[in-house]
């Protein structure tokens, strides 16, 4: 992986219709329809909207052979209107539907968790090695005929592993782990290689960004060990909608793109599918800006493992560092003192002097030469002022540094002064690589100074600010780096930056400040109005800080993706909902119009409600 210097991973090419993926091809953008696959007119119309919004592949669900066959009619009508963008069939539980779809569309996605193995029941199964090998042979017996159909029609496949739909067989041997997800994928990849089938794309997805990133990195490492280089499809499942969905997607997808990993992406939003393409395009374009950047000379700290990261050990300075949650520092040097009480920062930076309208009860960062001793104000230095740190008698001092400032003398100062916190900035085009280099230099020097990650942007587009800051900060946080965040942006109100920082910390699971919603983007299997339902559930429960609520269109990934959710709302049929407490379905087939109220009642009955 390209850890310090950005380079795309060298993948093999999968031929998908007339739009190949991998190799030197651009990172492709795709999405999935949410209308019924049997509603041909609606499906064609939505596909056209997605294509015109930038989709390079369009996916439809195919629950059975009937839906799979109808994809041929959708393909035909799109061709007649001049749209040749490859179509993809999404298959769960039904290998016969995969066989049928292989003759109708350019690519078929199968899920190893439910292609041959029995439906997930969360049961623990015991296998001898011989019995386990026999189960894999069953996969081969069913999978090879499907590959032969694909060969005959020039159809590509995606082996799409979801965290939420690992089989009981895999779960029993590996547990709910990255190793289990990778093992599930590799069973199918080895058969593809043995059968000389090259047009394969892989995805390993999860709603938990930590799990998703670690697992994809482990998959790449495992494939390299077996000399496999298949292209990768990236996505965060059940990312949600609005700001949360964009930030969570950018954290997971952006981190891997920063590593040089990924040949196609889907930003899974609980919104209309055509809304996903502009978001995905902005994210890809931002990462590509660092191509051919000035090289960063750096070394990785011995023992650091990108697959098994943990938070860097830092000393504690006035509640910053150690095991304390990362702090949020808001740059208010512009004089903007409007705040959102749901995202109040821990500190504010005011720059050179105290403005007249300075709010009370905030801890302040003040430029060192303008600092006056008082209980809630702390001096902020720049690199050239480092020798002056010892002249200031206060319990907390900040110093703004870049990677290039970390000289031997600077490291001596940082080690000696136990009251200092670093604001780690970057001016490099590959800011992530530069800040990674700085963190590894601190590790190798044995310097445990707390580090607040700092970035500057000039964005008037709020969505672009969310994507850029989430990709950059998220990458470092998932590496285990960062005792806080400081985001300065010229172009939007400061409160927008504050919300971004709290959203990024939530998405990386480093600091929980609000309710977390694990909501799917919906597809043709969803039989209720997902977007309206999400809005109603959020309105009723958004004050329940730290609670995780899953909102799923159907049972395909629902119970599994909600495995670490406290409560779940899952479509059970047309107009019917099932409610979950953890993994257990506690209320079945509730009328949709009553389901949100019953969810609130369930939360209250279990003692998790606050007024």
Swiss-Prot record:
Recorded hits in Pfam families, A to Z, give:
GcpE
Q: Which organism is it from?
A: Parabacteroides distasonis (strain ATCC 8503 / DSM 20701 / CIP 104284 / JCM 5825 / NCTC 11152)
Task: Supply the SUPFAM superfamilies for this chain.
Answer: Dihydropteroate synthetase-like, Nitrite and sulphite reductase 4Fe-4S domain-like
- Function of the protein: Converts 2C-methyl-D-erythritol 2,4-cyclodiphosphate (ME-2,4cPP) into 1-hydroxy-2-methyl-2-(E)-butenyl 4-diphosphate.
Question: What pathway, per the record?
Answer: Isoprenoid biosynthesis; isopentenyl diphosphate biosynthesis via DXP pathway; isopentenyl diphosphate from 1-deoxy-D-xylulose 5-phosphate: step 5/6
Enzyme Commission number: 1.17.7.3
- Gene Ontology biological-process annotations: isopentenyl diphosphate biosynthetic process, methylerythritol 4-phosphate pathway; terpenoid biosynthetic process
Q: Which reaction does it catalyse?
A: (2E)-4-hydroxy-3-methylbut-2-enyl diphosphate + oxidized [flavodoxin] + H2O + 2 H(+) = 2-C-methyl-D-erythritol 2,4-cyclic diphosphate + reduced [flavodoxin]
Gene of origin?
ispG
Cofactor binding comment, as recorded: Binds 1 [4Fe-4S] cluster.
Query: What keywords tag this UniProt record?
Result: 4Fe-4S, Iron, Iron-sulfur, Isoprene biosynthesis, Metal-binding, Oxidoreductase
Please tell me where [4Fe-4S] cluster binds in this chain: 520, 523, 554, 561
Q: Write the protein's name.
A: 4-hydroxy-3-methylbut-2-en-1-yl diphosphate synthase (flavodoxin)
The Swiss-Prot or TrEMBL record describes its family as follows: Belongs to the IspG family.
Mind listing the GO molecular function terms for this protein? Answer: 4 iron, 4 sulfur cluster binding; 4-hydroxy-3-methylbut-2-en-1-yl diphosphate synthase activity (ferredoxin); 4-hydroxy-3-methylbut-2-enyl-diphosphate synthase activity (flavodoxin); iron ion binding
* Enzyme class name: oxidoreductase
Record HAMAP family: IspG
Task: Name the cofactor(s).
Answer: [4Fe-4S] cluster
């Amino acid at each position: 992986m390209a850890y310090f210097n950005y380079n795309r991973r060298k993948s093999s090419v999968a031929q998908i219709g007339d739009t190949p993926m991998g190799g030197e091809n651009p990172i492709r953008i795709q999405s999935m329809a949410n209308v019924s696959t049997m509603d041909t007119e609606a499906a064609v119309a939505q596909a056209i909207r997605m294509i015109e919004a930038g989709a390079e592949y369009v996916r439809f669900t195919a629950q059975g052979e009937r839906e799979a066959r109808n994809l041929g009619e959708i393909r035909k009508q799109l061709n007649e209107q001049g749209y040749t963008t490859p179509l993809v069939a999404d298959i769960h539980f039904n290998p016969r539907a995969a066989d049928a779809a292989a003759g109708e569309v350019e690519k078929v996605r199968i899920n190893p968790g439910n292609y041959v193995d029995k439906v997930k029941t969360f049961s623990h199964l015991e296998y001898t090695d011989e019995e386990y090998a026999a189960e894999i042979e069953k996969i081969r017996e069913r999978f090879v005929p499907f590959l032969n159909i694909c060969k005959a029609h020039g159809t590509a496949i995606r082996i799409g592993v979801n965290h939420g739909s690992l089989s009981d067989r895999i779960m029993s041997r590996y547990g709910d782990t990255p190793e289990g997800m990778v093992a599930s994928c590799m069973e199918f990849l080895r058969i593809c290689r043995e059968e000389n089938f090259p047009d394969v794309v892989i995805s390993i997805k999860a709603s938990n960004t930590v799990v998703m990133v670690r697992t994809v990195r482990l998959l790449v490492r495992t494939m390299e060990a077996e000399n496999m280089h298949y292209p990768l499809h990236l996505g965060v499942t059940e990312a949600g909608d609005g700001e949360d969905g964009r930030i969570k997607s950018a954290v997971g997808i952006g981190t891997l793109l920063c590593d040089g990993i990924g040949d196609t992406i889907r930003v899974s939003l609980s919104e209309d599918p055509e809304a996903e393409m502009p978001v995905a395009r902005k994210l890809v374009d931002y990462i590509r800006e660092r191509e051919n950047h000035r090289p960063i000379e750096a070394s990785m700290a011995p023992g650091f493992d990108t697959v098994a990261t943990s938070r860097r050990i830092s000393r504690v300075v006035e509640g910053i560092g150690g095991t304390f949650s990362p702090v949020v520092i808001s740059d208010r040097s512009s004089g903007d003192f409007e705040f959102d009480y749901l995202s109040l920062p821990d500190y504010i930076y005011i720059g050179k002097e105290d403005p007249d309208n300075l709010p009370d009860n905030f801890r302040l960062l003040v430029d060192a030469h303008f600092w006056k001793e008082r209980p809630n104000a702390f001096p902020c230095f720049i690199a050239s002022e480092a020798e002056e740190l010892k002249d200031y008698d206060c319990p907390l001092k900040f110093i703004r540094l870049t990677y290039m400032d970390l000289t031997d003398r600077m490291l001596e100062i940082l080690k000696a002064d136990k009251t200092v916190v670093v604001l780690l900035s970057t001016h490099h085009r590959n800011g992530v690589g530069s800040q990674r280099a700085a963190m590894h230099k601190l590790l190798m020097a044995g310097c445990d100074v707390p580090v607040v990650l700092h970035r500057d942007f000039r964005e008037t587009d709020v969505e672009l600010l969310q994507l850029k800051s989430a990709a950059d900060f998220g990458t470092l946080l998932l590496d285990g780096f960062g005792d806080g965040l400081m985001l300065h942006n010229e172009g939007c109100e400061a409160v927008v930056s504050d919300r971004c920082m709290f959203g990024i910390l939530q998405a990386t699971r480093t600091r929980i400040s609000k309710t977390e919603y694990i909501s799917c983007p919906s597809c043709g299997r969803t039989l209720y109005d997902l977007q309206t339902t999400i809005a109603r559930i959020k309105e009723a429960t958004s004050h329940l800080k730290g609670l995780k609520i899953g909102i799923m269109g159907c049972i395909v990934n629902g119970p599994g993706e909600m495995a670490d959710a406290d409560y779940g709302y899952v479509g059970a049929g047309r107009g019917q909902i099932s409610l979950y407490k953890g993994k257990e379905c506690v209320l079945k087939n509730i009328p949709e119009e009553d389901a949100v109220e019953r969810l609130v009642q369930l939360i209250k009955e279990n003692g998790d409600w606050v007024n």
